[in-house]
From Swiss-Prot:
<dbReference type="GO" id="GO:0008270">
    <property type="term" value="F:zinc ion binding"/>
</dbReference>
<feature type="binding site">
    <location>
        <position position="251"/>
    </location>
    <ligand>
        <name>NADP(+)</name>
    </ligand>
</feature>
<feature type="binding site">
    <location>
        <position position="70"/>
    </location>
    <ligand>
        <name>Zn(2+) 1</name>
    </ligand>
</feature>
<keyword id="KW-0521">NADP</keyword>
<feature type="binding site">
    <location>
        <begin position="188"/>
        <end position="193"/>
    </location>
    <ligand>
        <name>NADP(+)</name>
    </ligand>
</feature>
<keyword id="KW-0560">Oxidoreductase</keyword>
<dbReference type="Pfam" id="PF00107">
    <property type="entry name" value="ADH_zinc_N"/>
</dbReference>
<dbReference type="InterPro" id="IPR013154">
    <property type="entry name" value="ADH-like_N"/>
</dbReference>
<comment type="pathway">
    <text>Aromatic compound metabolism; phenylpropanoid biosynthesis.</text>
</comment>
<protein>
    <recommendedName>
        <fullName>Probable cinnamyl alcohol dehydrogenase</fullName>
        <ecNumber>1.1.1.195</ecNumber>
    </recommendedName>
</protein>
<feature type="binding site">
    <location>
        <position position="47"/>
    </location>
    <ligand>
        <name>Zn(2+) 1</name>
    </ligand>
</feature>
<keyword id="KW-0479">Metal-binding</keyword>
<feature type="binding site">
    <location>
        <position position="106"/>
    </location>
    <ligand>
        <name>Zn(2+) 2</name>
    </ligand>
</feature>
<dbReference type="GO" id="GO:0009809">
    <property type="term" value="P:lignin biosynthetic process"/>
</dbReference>
<feature type="binding site">
    <location>
        <position position="163"/>
    </location>
    <ligand>
        <name>Zn(2+) 1</name>
    </ligand>
</feature>
<comment type="subunit">
    <text>Homodimer.</text>
</comment>
<dbReference type="InterPro" id="IPR002328">
    <property type="entry name" value="ADH_Zn_CS"/>
</dbReference>
Length: 357
């Protein structure tokens, strides 16, 4: 690894313990290597998994922890061997900042499935230093794990695409869920689900939103552009919709029954799990075997898919519904996120907040 001319100190907002409360934290960036870029953070989206990590709900958290993996910024320095980016370019950093680069997954541009992947925060860099995320003034990132923000994509809009956007884009491409006219269900209308609706519509699919109440029906159809809306508690309507969908993307991040949704699938239909559920899910097999249906999973996307997501959304003018907040509001934003009180994604204006640069 190379070294900086002088050690660079930055300020971020960190959790110190499982309470998850975030407060200012000053720390040193890792030393810049020949293939690294230094990114000044402009915006960073808030993801539900940030809450999970901050509160140690998976039992794997290390503190102090600076969260944030939907990072958009500007390149301020580059290493001696960086060819991909130039100083002054707008770039993004998603959920991972490293991998082994030699396994079967890495060789197929599926770095997110590498067993040696390095998370953007709450992990350890190759040099032994802790990774810290985007709720901070700057980051040092290997150029391989940085993507370019298209010129016609607003920076604040790009942030949610680096996690929520690629989370739905990747399975749609991998499982060939992009044929115009096919019928796709979106289960759950949160940060990931609302982008699922928009991206599916951009591919030309017929989209049905499935939710536990009708509170979001008007917005789902009139604002997001969904074609149909199902209330999962309405037994009669659910029965009428049986065997009507080619596939369902399940974005719910908490335990829930699967049988009611499997029944909505046509023969050979696929239910793709996208939510990180830390509890066991239970289901009986007849809905699967009697329709040759399948349950699959998908996790974010590789670096090529992440760039493709940004380019696709820029071309199709797919935008997120966001609420931009400052770092001084971040704890309130986390509380609201826990209550599902956001339409549909918080984005933190890091550069506009009072932090050392």
């Amino acid at each position: 690894m190379g070294s900086l001319e002088s050690e660079k100190t930055v300020t971020g907002y960190a959790a110190r313990d499982s309470s998850g409360h975030l407060s200012p934290y000053t720390y040193n960036l890792r030393k810049k290597g020949p293939e690294d870029v230094i990114v000044k953070v402009i915006y960073c989206g808030i993801c539900h998994s940030d809450l999970v990590q901050m509160r140690n709900e998976m039992g794997m958290s290390h503190y102090p922890m600076v969260p944030g993996h939907e990072v958009v910024g500007i390149v301020t320095e580059i290493g001696s061997e960086v060819k991909k980016f130039k100083v002054g370019e707008h770039v993004g950093v998603g959920c991972i900042v490293g991998s082994c680069r030699s396994c079967g997954n890495c060789n197929q541009s599926m770095e997110q499935y590498c067993s040696k992947r390095i998370w953007t925060y709450n992990d350890v860099n190759h040099d032994g230093t802790p990774t810290q995320g985007g709720f901070a003034s700057s980051m040092v990132v290997d150029q391989m794990f940085v993507v370019r923000i298209p010129e016609n994509l607003p920076l604040e809009q790009a942030a949610p695409l680096l996690c929520a956007g690629v989370t739905v884009f990747s399975p749609m491409k991998h499982f060939a869920m992009t044929e115009p006219g096919k019928k796709c269900g979106i289960l759950g209308l949160g940060g990931v689900g609302h982008l699922g609706v928009k991206i599916a519509k951009a591919f030309g699919l017929h989209v049905t939103v499935i939710s536990s109440s009708d509170k979001k029906k008007e917005e789902a159809m009139e604002v997001l552009g969904a074609d149909a809306y199902l209330v999962s508690k309405d037994t009669e309507k659910m029965m009428e919709a049986a065997e009507s969908l080619d596939y369902i993307m399940d974005t719910i991040p908490v335990a829930h029954p699967l049988e009611p949704y499997l029944a909505l699938l046509k023969t050979n239909g696929k239910l793709v799990m996208l939510g990180v559920v830390p509890e066991p899910l239970h289901f009986v097999t007849p809905p699967l075997i009697l329709g040759r249906r399948s349950i699959a999973g998908s996790f974010i996307g590789g670096m090529e898919e992440t760039q493709e997501t940004l380019d696709f959304c820029a071309e199709k003018k797919v935008s997120s519904m966001i609420e931009v907040v400052g770092l001084d509001y971040i704890n309130t934003a986390m509380e609201r996120l826990e209550k599902n009180d956001v339409r549909y994604r918080f984005v933190v204006d890091v550069a506009g907040s009072e932090l050392d640069n």
